[in-house]
Amino acid sequence: LTLLSTSAVADMLGITQQTVSRISREGVLPYEICGSRRVYNLNDIDEYMRRENLSRAPHDHPRMVDDLPEITAISFFSGALGLDIGLEEAGVPILLHAENDTKCRMTIDTNSPEAALLGDVNSLGVEQVRTYARIPSGREVDVMVGGPPCQSFSTAGARRAFDDARGNVFLRFLELAEEIQPRYLVIENVRGLLSTAYPLKPGGNPVHGGALRLILNRLKSMGYGVSFNLYNSANFGSPQMRERIIVVGKRDGTIAPWLTPTNSSDPIWSLPQWRTFREAASSIDGEQHFTQFPDKRLRYFKMLSEGQYWKDLPKNAQALAMGKAYRLSGGKTGFYRRIWWDKPCPTLVTSPTMPATDLCHPTENRPLSIEEYRAVQEFPKNWIVRGGLTDVYRQLGNAVPIALGKAVGQTILNDMIGIDTSIPYRDFPYSRYKRTSNITWKMP
C-alpha cells in the first residue's frame, strides 16, 4: 500500500493542489484522512488516470539517447505532434519537443518518450535547448519548427496580435531562433496572419498586415531569406481542406522553394485527385467515441442530408434554427453543416459542435468522432492522445495535418541538396485565395 500526499497527487496529474482538493470533495478521487490531512492510495490514482485516459504528468527531461542523427531538428509549441510526425515521415527526426499544455505533454511523452521535453518557451534559452536535445555546441541545429498559438491572429477571434500574451510567445520564439541560428526556421500559422493589423512603429496606428510585416522584418534583420505561402492541405494528400501559412526561413539568405503539391482537384496538373472523407473513414474499425449535439439543434440536423447546411432547411425552420445568427452577415456556411462523403473534410476545429463550424457526419445524426478526427488528420492508429473527450478533440483539432508536415520536411531535405521539385508548379493554386505568398503578398 502506497499513500500519497495532496502535493504528490497534484504533481502526478499536472494540476494544482487546489484542484486535487476540489475533485476530492466532489467524490472523484477517493481519499482518507490521516491526522488533519488527506492521503491518497496510489492504486486509486492509477485507476483514476486509466479512467480519464491520463498518464503521469511528465517533467522536463533530456533526450534519452546519445547518438546524433545526420539531421538535427527541434520543435516548439508541439501540441499533439502532427507537424512533427509529418517531418519525421519525411526523414527529419525531431530531437526535442517544447510544449506547455499539460494534456499535450502527456500525449507527447506517451508517444515520443525518448525525445527531449521542455515547457514554456518564455523560460528557455539556447544552452538549455542544446543540452536537453543533446546537440553539442559545435554541431548546427538544422531545422527549428514551431506553430506559435494562432488565436491572436485567427480571423475568428479578436486578432490582438502581439498585444495578446499568446502573441508575445511568438516574439519570444523569434528571439530564441535568433539565439539558436538554425539553418532552416519553419513557422506554421493561420491565414489570419496575412491580414492581422499591428503598428509598424511604437505608438503608431495599427496597419493591415502589420503583424506579418513585423515578423518578416525581424527575420530579414536576422539575415534569413524568407519564403511563405498559404497552403491547402488537400493539395498535399490530406483528406481535409485546411489552409495554413508555412513560412520557411533560410539562414544563408537564399529563398527556399514552395512546397511541392501531390494532389489537385484540377486534372490540368496531372496529379491524383483530392482525397476524401470516405477514404479517411474507411480505415476506422472498432467503437467510435463522440460528443453529442444538443437536442434543440439535433432536430434540425435530422432534416438535412449529406452536404447540406442551414440554408437547406425548410424556409419556416431557418430563422428558428439559427436564432440571433440568422441576421449575421456573411455566408454562415458552417452552421448546421453535414459534410460530404466524397470530398475532403472541412477544416477540423477544436470541437465539432461549435455552431459556426459544425462538423456533422454525412449520414448519421452525430458530430464527427475522435476516431474520424484522427483518421482525417492521418495520425497513426496506435497514437494515444491523452485526456477526456474534450481534450482529445482539442488536440486533434489544433494539429497540423501530417501530410502537410511531410511536405514541409521533403521540401527542406530536397533544398539541402539543391533540388527544387516545385518548379513545374510555379502557377499552382495552393489555396483559394490570391496574393498569399512572399512574391504576391503586399500590405495595402
Label the model's feature ranges.
Residues 7, 12-18, 22-26, 38, ...:
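S-adenosyl-L-methionine-dependent DNA methyltransferase catalytic core
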Residues 25-33:
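Short, solvent-exposed alpha-helical "recognition" segments
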Residues 53-184, 190-208:
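Core alpha/beta nucleotide-donor-binding catalytic domains of modification enzymes
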Residues 84-85, 151-155, 193-196, 237-241, ...:
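Short catalytic/ligand-binding loop motif for oxyanion handling, primarily in non-cytosolic enzymes
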Residues 131-134, 241-248:
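Short, surface-exposed amphipathic charged segments that create phosphate/polyanion-binding patches used
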Residues 202-226:
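Conserved Class I S-adenosyl-L-methionine
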Residues 224-235:
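Conserved S-adenosyl-L-methionine
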